[in-house]
Swiss-Prot record:
Residues 240-350 are annotated as: Disordered. Residues 321-349 form a coiled coil. The keyword Ribonucleoprotein does not apply. Residues 319-338 have a biased composition (Basic residues). Residues 240-254, 339-350 have a biased composition (Basic and acidic residues). Residues 256-301 have a biased composition (Low complexity). Pfam families: FAM199X. This is Protein FAM199X-B. Belongs to the FAM199 family. Keywords: Coiled coil. InterPro entries: FAM199X_fam.
Length: 377
């Protein structure tokens, strides 16, 4: 290199010769170094080790600092083997870039390059460099704009939400622990609100056949390890059979069967009366009148029977509710009395005042007075 060029860097006339008048720091923190690369690379113009490489337009965005539209000279990058297309994409690779000997040690340019590498960390792992493909095989040596894109941060919430599975269709072994707890709570709420005491006891026997239930128990704890796929299947089928909707369906079926039987009896009577009218033409009008009267009476009786059936069903429901309420009150009173006795016994045992207690029974025999007693004396 010429001595004049080194003197230009060592003893510059201007305080900052590497930055042109256009290169300035704006208020937004953007550094425009459009002529920086050309002046920097001119010191190595005569180095035969560097391969000619056409000027590129490149953009860098790192930590809020933008270097835009910089025309670099052909010797800014080191020699690249143009035979392989993938080598052009490795210009920004950390390992390949650090192996480039752009500036020899001891030169002013090496100091400038070290300051550049200090200002822009090329091995910054926070960025994922995206380099669009350039058509090198067709003779185009111009690289596209290199735009760093910030990858997705792992701390950002994932937009994909887990779909809520239908637990009524899953076997017990296929559920997670949270799903098992959730499904047990759902079954407990459904059974306790929609079924009677007998159905609840049956379901408890299905889940745990060895369970001991006393009349004073008001709750039953279901252990997760007691349930299996087969038991859960039986519980589901039992709930499906004894649900309130199924009970209403069975009651309506009983009503329809009863009304059908009564209707068949009425129709048999009408057929017999019509056959009698065919034998005796003289009494045909009377038989038809009797048939119409019997039909109307049958309709009335069927209506009354339906009303009586619904009334009896409502009365049975009221009686069952009343009995269950009384049973609950009795159980509550018994439980309260037992708790009171236990609390009293615990107090007596803690105080120690009744350790030597003896219970004595005293009986007084009253003598019958034969004569009258004068109370005035």
């Amino acid at each position: 290199m010429s001595e004049g060029l080194y003197e230009k860097f060592l003893a510059p006339d201007e305080p900052f010769p590497l930055l042109s008048q256009r290169g300035s720091v704006s208020e937004e923190g953007c550094l425009d170094v459009s002529d920086f690369g050309c002046q920097l690379s001119s010191c190595h113009r005569t180095d035969p080790r560097l391969h000619r490489f056409h000027s590129n337009r490149w953009n860098l965005t790192s930590c809020g600092t933008s270097v835009a539209s910089s025309e670099c000279s052909e010797e800014l990058f080191s020699s690249v083997s143009v035979g392989d297309q993938d080598d052009c994409y490795s210009l920004l690779d950390d390992q390949d870039f650090t192996s480039f000997d752009l500036f020899p040690e001891g030169s002013v340019c090496s100091d400038v390059s070290s300051s550049i590498s200090t200002y822009w960390d090329w091995s910054d792992s926070e960025f994922e460099w995206q380099l669009p493909g350039s058509d090198i095989a067709s003779g185009s040596d111009v690289l596209s704009d290199i735009i760093p894109s910030i990858p997705n941060s792992p701390c950002l919430p994932s937009k994909k939400k887990n779909k809520h599975r239908n637990l009524d269709e899953l076997p017990w072994s296929a559920m997670t622990n949270d799903e098992q707890v959730e499904y047990i709570e759902y079954l407990s709420r459904k059974v306790s609100t929609e079924m009677g005491l007998r159905e609840q006891l049956d379901i408890i026997k299905i889940i745990d056949p060895t369970a001991q239930i006393s009349p004073t128990d008001s709750e039953f704890i279901i252990e997760l390890n007691c349930l299996t796929d087969e038991k859960l299947k039986q519980v589901r089928s039992y709930i499906k059979e004894h649900s309130p909707r199924q009970r209403c369906t069975r009651e309506s079926w009983k009503r329809t069967s009863y009304s059908t039987a009564s209707t068949s009896g009425v129709s048999g009577a009408s057929v017999s009366s019509s056959s009698a009218s065919m034998v005796s033409t003289a009494s045909s009008t009377g038989s038809s009148g009797g048939n119409s009267a019997s039909n109307s009476s049958a309709n009335m009786s069927r209506t009354h029977s339906d009303n009586n059936l619904s009334a009896s069903a409502a009365e049975r429901i009221r009686d069952s509710k009343k009995r269950s309420k009384q049973r609950k009150l009795q159980q509550k009173a018994l439980r309260k009395r037992q708790l009171k006795e236990q609390r009293q016994a615990r107090k007596e045992r803690i105080s120690g005042l009744f350790l030597n207690e003896e219970v004595l029974s005293v009986k007084v025999n009253e003598e019958d007075h034969e004569g009258d007693v004068d109370v005035l004396m």
